[in-house]
Curated annotation (Swiss-Prot):
Protein family according to the UniProt entry: Belongs to the DEFL family.
Record's protein name: Defensin-like protein 54
Organism the protein comes from: Arabidopsis thaliana (Mouse-ear cress)
Gene Ontology BP annotations: defense response to fungus; killing of cells of another organism
Gene Ontology cellular component terms for the protein in this record: extracellular region
Disulfide feature: C39-C76, C43-C67, C52-C74, C56-C75
Length: 79
């Protein structure tokens, strides 16, 4: 009986650890873009950091732009 109880406890700790690590990833994807201004579009192979920077700096109120978050979005920073 003691072996089953210990095994169940270890199993639950592993499951909780894995589930909390997913919450951290989700929180990062929400918090990180909040540091920036407008997030215009999703970044992909065609739209990378360079394209994001170019699009943001063409608007007069933004100083720069970066692909941030998960999934990555082009977010502009006011200057």
């Amino acid at each position: 009986m003691g072996i089953k109880k210990t095994s169940a406890t270890v199993f639950l700790v592993i499951i909780l650890t894995i589930s909390f690590s997913y919450y951290d990833v989700e929180a990062e994807s929400v918090i990180e873009p909040a540091k920036y201004g407008a997030c215009l579009f999703l970044c992909d192979a065609r739209r990378d950091d360079h394209a994001c920077f170019y699009d943001c700096t063409n608007v007069a109120i933004y100083r720069t732009g970066h692909c941030v978050g998960n999934p990555p979005r082009c977010c502009c920073i006011r200057g």
